[in-house]
Curated annotation (Swiss-Prot):
EC numbers for this chain: 2.3.1.234
The organism of origin for this protein: Bradyrhizobium sp. (strain BTAi1 / ATCC BAA-1182)
Binding-site residues for Fe cation, renumbered to this chain: 113, 117, 307
Family recorded in the similarity comment: Belongs to the KAE1 / TsaD family.
Protein name: tRNA N6-adenosine threonylcarbamoyltransferase
Predominant location: cytoplasm
Record key words, sorted: Acyltransferase, Cytoplasm, Iron, Metal-binding, Transferase, tRNA processing
Lineage: Bacteria, Pseudomonadati, Pseudomonadota, Alphaproteobacteria, Hyphomicrobiales
Pfam families the UniProt entry points to: TsaD (PF00814)
Signal peptide: none
Gene field: tsaD
GO CC, any one term: cytoplasm
PROSITE patterns in the cross-refs: GLYCOPROTEASE (PS01016)
Alphabetical GO biological process terms: tRNA threonylcarbamoyladenosine modification
Catalysed reaction, written as an equation: L-threonylcarbamoyladenylate + adenosine(37) in tRNA = N(6)-L-threonylcarbamoyladenosine(37) in tRNA + AMP + H(+)
Length: 355
């Protein structure tokens, strides 16, 4: 399966095989980040991202096919992320996949980008359904029950900022380079997490939702109180911010796991995916939560947590095995819920992230 990913600021292509025993093998996984193109602006510029996908995608597909050592005739299908994401990039990837499918008479699979993250652990580990997924990225923060391919139940979501978005915005406040998430993590290692008493959002609530905008505002206010922000101030602010995120996340996940057990029984695992899952401090916190819940933690390698083509190819293989094939009328989507039955969390007006 050829997989194509173009939903944000990574252009990626990969070839993944599925053996007769169901195990996956990554034959190639080529990713070209657009960090340099967007660094000047301190964030992703959709028009620049779309043009970069146009410029790079054909070359990356050629490289992925060469590295895999196969011809197009060897493919059982081509999968592309059809959303959710920046619509210009999504159109580039899906249109390219349709062309390949038409020319080489191979099945097309239009993959939900979030589903690809949700299924990635089955590419790297032997894991059965149902499992509990913590998906945290620049655009999404969700706790999801993964009951099967195409069968997802959202247990919790952010009601404002996504976790990766909050990390990036705090980095920007502090003048740290883009992308900000890794910069905050690195600075936090040198800081005093007890110096600033930031709020722990949503702590103790009976639902499993997240909220990060208030914490982000608290960081901004604290920065404003410091006359001259030093390197140590930056490190302490990052450490204190990250500590608040970790405590809040652990609490939200404990509630999410309880909700999972009430509906599905004990999960086969707690699984983490998305770019934020590459943060080592968050990984350690998730491990503690899993141990307390009496389940195992499964986290794909960092390179498979961030956006990549292998996860799209694997999701395509999972869907193809169940006969889930799409036609040429498959539409690109800027928004695409993973859980089709999800509703907006009650009592919150700002629900842009994840909806």
């Amino acid at each position: 399966m050829l997989g194509i990913e173009t939903t944000c600021d990574e252009t990626a292509a990969a070839v993944v095989a599925r053996d007769s025993d169901g195990k996956g093998r990554i034959l190639s996984n080529v990713v070209r980040s657009q960090t340099d193109e967007h660094a000047l602006y301190g964030g992703v510029v959709p028009e620049i991202a779309a043009r970069a996908h146009v410029d790079m995608l054909d070359h990356l597909i050629d490289a992925a096919m060469r590295e895999a050592g196969i011809d197009y005739a060897d493919l059982n299908g081509v999968a592309a992320a059809a959303g959710p994401g920046l619509i210009g990039g999504v159109i580039v990837g899906l249109t390219t996949a349709k062309a390949i499918a038409l020319v080489h008479d191979t099945p097309l699979i239009a993959v939900n980008h979030l589903e690809a993250h949700a299924l990635t652990p089955r590419l790297t580990d032997a894991i059965d359904f149902p499992y509990c997924l913590f998906l945290a990225s620049g655009g999404h923060t969700q706790i999801v029950a993964v009951a099967g391919v195409g069968d997802y139940v959202r247990l919790g979501t952010t009601v404002d900022d996504a976790m990766g978005e909050a990390f990036d915005k705090v980095a920007k406040m502090l003048g740290l380079p883009y992308p900000g998430g890794p910069q905050v993590e690195e600075a936090a290692q040198r800081g005093d997490a007890a110096r600033f008493a930031f709020p722990r959002p949503m702590l103790g609530r009976s639902d499993a939702n997240f909220s990060l905008s208030g914490l982000k505002t608290a960081v901004r206010n604290e920065i404003g109180r410091i006359a001259h922000v030093s390197a140590q101030d930056i490190a302490d602010l990052c450490a204190s911010f990250q500590a608040a995120v970790l405590e809040s996340t652990a609490d939200r996940l404990r509630v999410g796991l309880d909700l999972f057990k009430q509906r599905f029984g004990a999960p086969t695992a707690l699984v983490a995916a998305g770019g934020v899952a590459a943060n080592q401090a968050i990984r350690a916190a998730l491990d503690d939560v899993a141990q307390q819940a009496g389940t195992r933690l499964i986290m794909p390698p960092p390179a498979l947590c961030t956006d990549n083509g292998a996860m799209i190819a694997w999701a395509g293989l999972e869907r193809l095995a169940l006969g889930m094939i799409d036609g040429m009328d498959a539409a690109p989507r800027a928004r695409w819920l993973l859980d089709a039955n999800a509703s907006v969390p009650g009592k919150f007006a700002n629900t842009r992230a994840g909806f």
